[in-house]
C-alpha cells in the first residue's frame, strides 16, 4: 500500500489519517485524528512495506514498547499511546503529535547561544538519563541505549511552563541491555557522523556510547560544525575519524566557557572510560556551568565579608561569594584560562591521585596553582562544591606549612587536597610569599582516565589574615633551624587528622544558597 493510498483512511476504526508528514528508512509518519477522543491530533507511524519480515516487525513492536514505557517516565521522550496491525497486517503505532523544530533545523544557520544551549542540553540529558536507568521489560529491569542520538532526533516544541520543551525521538534502533544476554559482536547500526568508536566496532554498548554521540551533538549545537571530519564519508573514513582523529578545539569566537569546553571534550573521549560515566554527571556539570554564568560579579564588600562564627574560635573564617565555580575578575580570566587549557600533566609526575604546587607563568605574571589528579567523575562532581582552605605552620624540628584545600559537597562529602611547603627551600619560601601577596590560587584538575590536558579549573581565595601570616612565615623561616622534614610532615598530617571532623562539621552547616569559599585559620 502506497502512502497516497492511505490518505483519509480510518485506521482501526479510530484513527483518521489526514496527511503524510514524514518518512524514513523505517517507515512513514502521518498526522491523524483520534475519533474516539473527539478528533484530538495524533501521529501514526507505519513500518515500511519493504521491511515486512518477522525480525523487523519484532523490532518495530519493541520500539513502540520502549517508547511507551519511557514516555510514561519522562516528558522528554515522545509518548506512544497505541500499537496495532492494519488490515494488511502492517504494524503501526500511535504517538503524541508534536509541532516544533528539530535541532538540526534550529542550528542550520547559526549555533545556539550558551545560555539557550544549557537549557536544551539539560533536558536532553534528563530524557537520556531516564532511558539509561531503564524500564521493566518482560519482568526484567533493562537499561535502554538509544544508539542514534543526533540533532534530527531531538525536537523542540513550545511549552507554556518551560518555554522550550525537548523531546527525544526515534527509538527505532534502541538497545535493551539485558543481564542474561551474552556479550557478542553486533551488526553496525547508527548514523556514522555521531557513532561512538565502540558502536562502529559492533561491540556491546552501554550508556557511555550515547554520551559520545551526545558530545558530538553538543559540539555541533555550540558551533554549527562537526568536531571531526573524515577523509571521506565512507564507513572506513568515519571509523578512522572516530578512532584516531582529535576533535577540533573550540574557536575563541564562540566565547564558550572553559568548563563547558572541557565537558564536551570529555564526552568525546575515544575510550568509554575517559567519558563521564553517567548522564547524571553531565547534568551536575551543566548546573555548575549555569551557576557560573548567572551569578553576579563579586563586589569588594563580598570579598572581605567576615563570618567569625562559621568555624570555631581557633579557625576564624572568611566567606566569599563567588559568581560560580572558579571565576575571577574578567581582566584575568581569559588569559589564565587560555593558558590552563594548553597545560599538560608533567612527564615526571605519576599518573595517580596526587596534589602538588606549581607556579604558572601567565601574561599577568607568576601565579600560584595547585595541580590535582582525580577520577573524571569526581572532578565533575566537585565543580559545584564549597571551597575551603587553611594554612598550618610547624617550626620544629623543621619549618613547614601544611596547605589544606577541601572541596565539600553536601551529598558526596569532602575531598581533601593537602599539600606541604618546605620553608627551608627557596621554592617553598617563594610559594608562601606568592600566596600571601596574591591572596588567590588556581586549582587545575586532570582526569586519571584522560590525563593529557587540564580538564577543569577553579580559583580559591585566601583570607587576608592568612595572607599576612604566609608572608611573615616566608620571611622568618629563613633564620629558623632545619632538620628532619619528614618528622614535621608526619606531625602536620596528624594535626590535619585531628582537625578534619571539625572542618567537615562546620562546612556541613554552610547554606548551599550560592557557591562559597571558606578560608580559615
Swiss-Prot record:
The Protein kinase domain, residue ranges: 15-289
Keywords: ATP-binding, Kinase, Nucleotide-binding, Phosphoprotein, Serine/threonine-protein kinase, Transferase
E.C. designation(s): 2.7.11.1
Pfam families: Pkinase
S-S bonds: none
Post-translational modification: Autophosphorylated.
Keyword Phosphoprotein included in the entry's annotation: yes
Binding site for ATP: 21-29, 45
Substrates-to-products reaction catalysed: L-seryl-[protein] + ATP = O-phospho-L-seryl-[protein] + ADP + H(+); L-threonyl-[protein] + ATP = O-phospho-L-threonyl-[protein] + ADP + H(+)
UniProt superkingdom: Bacteria
Active site residues per record: 148 (proton acceptor)
PROSITE patterns in alphabetical order: PROTEIN_KINASE_ATP, PROTEIN_KINASE_DOM, PROTEIN_KINASE_ST
Described function: Protein kinase that regulates cellular motility via phosphorylation of membrane proteins.
Sequence similarity: Belongs to the protein kinase superfamily. Ser/Thr protein kinase family.
Protein name, as recorded: Serine/threonine-protein kinase A
Lineage of the organism: Bacteria, Bacillati, Cyanobacteriota, Cyanophyceae, Synechococcales
Amino acid at each position: 500500500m502506497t502512502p497516497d493510498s492511505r490518505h483519509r483512511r480510518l485506521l482501526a476504526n479510530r484513527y483518521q489519517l489526514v496527511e503524510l508528514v514524514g518518512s524514513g528508512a523505517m517507515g512513514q509518519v502521518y498526522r491523524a485524528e483520534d475519533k474516539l477522543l473527539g478528533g484530538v491530533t495524533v501521529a501514526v507511524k507505519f513500518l515500511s512495506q519493504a521491511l515486512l519480515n518477522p525480525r523487523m516487525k519484532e523490532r518495530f513492536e519493541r520500539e513502540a514498547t520502549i517508547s511507551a514505557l519511557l514516555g510514561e517516565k519522562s516528558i522528554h521522550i515522545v509518548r506512544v499511546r497505541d500499537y496495532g496491525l492494519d488490515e494488511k497486517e502492517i504494524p503501526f503505532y500511535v504517538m503524541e503529535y508534536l509541532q516544533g523544530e528539530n535541532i538540526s533545523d534550529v542550528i542550520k544557520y547559526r549555533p545556539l547561544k550558551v545560555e539557550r544551549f544549557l537549557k536544551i542540553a539539560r533536558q536532553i540529558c534528563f530524557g537520556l538519563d531516564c532511558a539509561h536507568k531503564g524500564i521493566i521489560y518482560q519482568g526484567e529491569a533493562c537499561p535502554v541505549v538509544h544508539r542514534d542520538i543526533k540533532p534530527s532526533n531531538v525536537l523542540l516544541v513550545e511549552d507554556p511552563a518551560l518555554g522550550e520543551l525537548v523531546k527525544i525521538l526515534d527509538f527505532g534502533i534502541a538497545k535493551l541491555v539485558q543481564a542474561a544476554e551474552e556479550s557478542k559482536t553486533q551488526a553496525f547500526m547508527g548514523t556514522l557522523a555521531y557513532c561512538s568508536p565502540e558502536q562502529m566496532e559492533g561491540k556491546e554498548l552501554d550508556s557511555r556510547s550515547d554520551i559520545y554521540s551526545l558530545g558530538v551533538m553538543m559540539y555541533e549545537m555550540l558551533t554549527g560544525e562537526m568536531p571531526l571530519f573524515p577523509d571521506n564519508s565512507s564507513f572506513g573514513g568515519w571509523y578512522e575519524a572516530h578512532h584516531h582523529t582529535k576533535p577540533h578545539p573550540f574557536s575563541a569566537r564562540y566565547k564558550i566557557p572553559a568548563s563547558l569546553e572541557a565537558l564536551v571534550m570529555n564526552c568525546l573521549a575515544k575510550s568509554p572510560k575517559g567519558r563521564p560515566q553517567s548522564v547524571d554527571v553531565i547534568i551536575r556539570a551543566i548546573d555548575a556551568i549555569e551557576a557560573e554564568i548567572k551569578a553576579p560579579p563579586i563586589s569588594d564588600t563580598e570579598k572581605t565579608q567576615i563570618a567569625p562564627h562559621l568555624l570555631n574560635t581557633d579557625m576564624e573564617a572568611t566567606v566569599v561569594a563567588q559568581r560560580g565555580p572558579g571565576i575571577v575578575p574578567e581582566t584575568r580570566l581569559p588569559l589564565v584560562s587560555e593558558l590552563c587549557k594548553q597545560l599538560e600533566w608533567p612527564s615526571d609526575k605519576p599518573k595517580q591521585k596526587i596534589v602538588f604546587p606549581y607556579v604558572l607563568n601567565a601574561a599577568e605574571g607568576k601565579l600560584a596553582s595547585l595541580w590535582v589528579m582525580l577520577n573524571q567523575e569526581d572532578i565533575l562532581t566537585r565543580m559545584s562544591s564549597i571551597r575551603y582552605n587553611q594554612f598550618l605552620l610547624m617550626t620544629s624540628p623543621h619549618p613547614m606549612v601544611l596547605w589544606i584545600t577541601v572541596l565539600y559537597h553536601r551529598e558526596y562529602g569532602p575531598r581533601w587536597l593537602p599539600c606541604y611547603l618546605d620553608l627551608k627551600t627557596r621554592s617553598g619560601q617563594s610559594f608562601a610569599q606568592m600566596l600571601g601577596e596574591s591572596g588567590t590560587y588556581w586549582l587545575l584538575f586532570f582526569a586519571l582516565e584522560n590525563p593529557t590536558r587540564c580538564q577543569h579549573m577553579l580559583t580559591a581565595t585566601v583570607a587576608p589574615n592568612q595572607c599576612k601570616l604566609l608572608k611573615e612565615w616566608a620571611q622568618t623561616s629563613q633564620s629558623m633551624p632545619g632538620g628532619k622534614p619528614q618528622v614535621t610532615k608526619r606531625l602536620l598530617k596528624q594535626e590535619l587528622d585531628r582537625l578534619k571532623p571539625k572542618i567537615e562539621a562546620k562546612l556541613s552547616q554552610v547554606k548551599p544558597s550560592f557557591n562559597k569559599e571558606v578560608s580559615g585559620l
